[in-house]
C-alpha cells in the first residue's frame, strides 16, 4: 500500500510532462513581441506580481501567530500550500476558466489557454494592452492564490489538511474562476452590467468573506473557551508583509506605471495608516 502511495507523485509528474508535450505553451515558430508592449509597465507589473505573492506568506504569519501553539505549523501550512495547489490548477485550466472565451458571460472556455497554450506570444489582454499576456495571467494567479488562503482564518484549528486541499480546489474552480470571469472579462455577465471591481473587492474579498462565513457556521465554534495567541511577533510580521504586498495588489491593478497606479498606492498608504492608528485608539480605550 505504501509503495502505491509513493508512486502517485511520479504518476502525476509523468502526466504533466506528457500533457506539456502534447500541448506545448511555446509556439513552434518564434515571433516578435506583440505591438504595444511597454517596458516600464512590464517592469512595474513584474514587481507588483512579486509583491502580491508576498502577501500569502504574510497571511500565514498573521494567522499562525493568532492560533494556539500546537496548531501554528498546520495553520501556516494552509496558506503556503495554496501557492502550490492553486498555481498548478491555474496553469492547467484555471486561467482559461477565468479569462478564456466566454460562455454566456458566466465561465470561460477551459480549452482557450489550456496548459498556458500560446501564452508567450499571445495577444495582450484587452484591459491590459501594454503588458504581455503571460504576465497578466501570472499576476492574476497571485490573486487566485491568496483568496482561498484568506478563508483559513474562519476555520483555523477545525479542519483536516486533506479536506482543506479539496476545499481550495473546489473553491478555485467553482467559485473564484466563474466570479472572476463574470466580473473581469469584457464579455462577463457582471462586467456588462457595469460592475467595477478595481482590485478584487468583489472577486477576492466578497467571495472569501462569504465562504468564510459559511465555513464558520458549518464547522461551529472552537471547543476551547480561553484562547491566547501563540506568537504576537508573527502577527506583527504578517501585518507588515501584508501591508507591503498590498501596494502591488492595489497599485498593480492599474496594469501599468501610470497616474492611476500612483493614486492607488497613495490611497493604500493613507488608508492603512489611518486604519492602524484608529485600531490602536479603540484598543487603548
Regions found by a protein language model. Name each.
Residues 1-285:
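Hydrophobic alpha-helical transmembrane bundles of multi-pass membrane proteins
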